[in-house]
């Protein structure tokens, strides 16, 4: 009986030993697998950045962090056919002091060469604010793309298109004039904003934009560019890329159905797509952002997710030496649907329309 017990004990020890041996083997295999997986991810990450990383001197005026600025507050708006209601001198000054002193932005983008943009430049000059500007030349529709733009329900009348061509020439002359008058503040000029994509309502022919770019380049000393969606650049850019001084791309993962867990990786894929087409072009990201509220996106839009995308993407582009204009500084409630204040177009800012900071920058304000 005693020998039988000893035999049972020996058998149990053997089984335990075998089980422990199997566990050790599984652990070793798991560690090796994790190591190989991590190494693969790192190698893929390095591979991604090898095709995208730029030289330090590719940064616009040496800045990686920049921001899009449009100062329209509640009750204010640009010209929508019945005249504009612009911010006051004091309001613009308040905004620029927030951006330069509280958030340390020293490079902003403005979208047109109208009265409001001239005011922004004058406020910077007269108050000696440490901010440089990418000036915009806004182009109106010269083609009716009512078949591809979802909110154009009927063709744009031909007489309106002809009038727009004249107004575009006037806008170009204004842009040239402002760039030359404020040559110490304006560091680049952008001709047309999302005027090349089929889905927008102010489409202009590519050859026409090339002609406009060449005209502006002959008249100013600053760099000249055209800003549009990354996909347009990846698919259609061959001729335009030859005449601009750098390529300006827009990236919005959330508009393409992505949630925050894919925000950074999808943005990198967008840039890779552009780089494959024009590998030697200097790239500036002139719009990238994440809304804090949007009925269109449901839970994909939130202040926390905006904060995460801002921190991840802006850090990554800094490492890549890519100047990135975050879209945007302040919410603008004049945009989008007038009867729905929860629309995405109204909620891209780091601040609300009332100039209250969102989660994305509260930590920065405490630090500063």
Regions found by a protein language model. Name each.
Residues 28-30:
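C-terminal motif of bacterial Sec signal peptides marking the signal peptidase cleavage site
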Residues 40-58, 62, 299-302, 316-368:
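Aromatic-rich peripheral "rim/lid" segments of glycoside hydrolase catalytic domains that contact
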Residues 62-148:
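N-terminal carbohydrate-binding/catalytic regions of secreted carbohydrate-active enzymes
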Residues 197, 201, 251-255, 277-307, ...:
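Active-site clefts of carbohydrate-active enzymes
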Residues 135-137, 146-148, 187, 193, ...:
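Aromatic- and acid-rich polysaccharide-binding/catalytic face
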Residues 213-235, 281-289, 323-333:
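Aromatic-lined carbohydrate-recognition surfaces of secreted/lumenal glycan-active proteins
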Residues 108, 189, 247, 285-287, ...:
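Conserved, mostly hydrophobic/aromatic
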Residues 119-222:
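Substrate-binding cleft of extracellular glycoside hydrolase catalytic domains
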């Amino acid at each position: 009986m005693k020998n039988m017990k000893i035999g049972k004990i020996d058998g149990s020890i053997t089984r335990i030993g075998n089980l422990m041996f199997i566990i050790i083997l599984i652990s070793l295999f798991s560690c090796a697998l994790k190591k190989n997986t991590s190494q693969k991810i790192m190698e893929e990450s390095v591979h991604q950045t090898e095709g995208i990383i730029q030289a330090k001197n590719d940064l616009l005026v040496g800045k990686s962090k920049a921001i899009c600025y449009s100062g329209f507050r509640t009750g204010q708006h640009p010209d929508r056919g019945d005249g504009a209601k612009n911010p006051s001198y004091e309001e613009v000054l308040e905004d620029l002091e927030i951006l330069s002193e509280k958030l340390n932005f020293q490079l902003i983008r403005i979208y047109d060469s109208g009265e409001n943009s001239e005011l922004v430049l004058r406020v910077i000059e007269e108050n000696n604010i440490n901010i440089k500007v990418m000036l915009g030349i806004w182009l109106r529709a010269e083609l009716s793309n009512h078949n591809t733009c979802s909110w154009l329900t009927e063709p744009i009348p031909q007489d309106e298109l002809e009038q727009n061509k004249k107004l575009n020439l006037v806008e170009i002359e204004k842009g040239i004039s402002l760039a030359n008058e404020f040559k110490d503040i304006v560091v680049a000029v952008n001709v047309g904003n999302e005027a090349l994509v089929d889905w927008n309502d102010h489409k202009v022919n590519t050859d026409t934009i090339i002609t406009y770019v060449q005209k502006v380049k002959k008249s100013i000393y600053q760099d000249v560019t055209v800003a549009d969606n990354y996909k347009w650049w990846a698919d259609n850019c061959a001729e335009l890329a030859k005449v601009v001084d750098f390529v300006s791309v827009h990236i919005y993962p959330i508009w393409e159905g992505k949630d925050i867990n894919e925000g950074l990786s999808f943005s990198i894929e967008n840039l890779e797509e552009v780089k494959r087409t024009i590998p030697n072009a200097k790239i500036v990201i002139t719009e990238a952002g994440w809304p804090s509220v949007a009925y269109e996106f449901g839970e994909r839009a939130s202040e926390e997710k905006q904060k995460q995308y801002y921190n991840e993407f802006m850090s990554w582009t800094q490492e890549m030496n890519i100047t990135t204009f975050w879209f945007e500084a302040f919410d603008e409630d004049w945009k989008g649907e007038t009867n729905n204040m929860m629309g995405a177009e109204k909620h891209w800012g780091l601040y609300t329309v009332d100039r209250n900071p969102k989660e994305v920058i509260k930590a920065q304000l405490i630090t500063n």
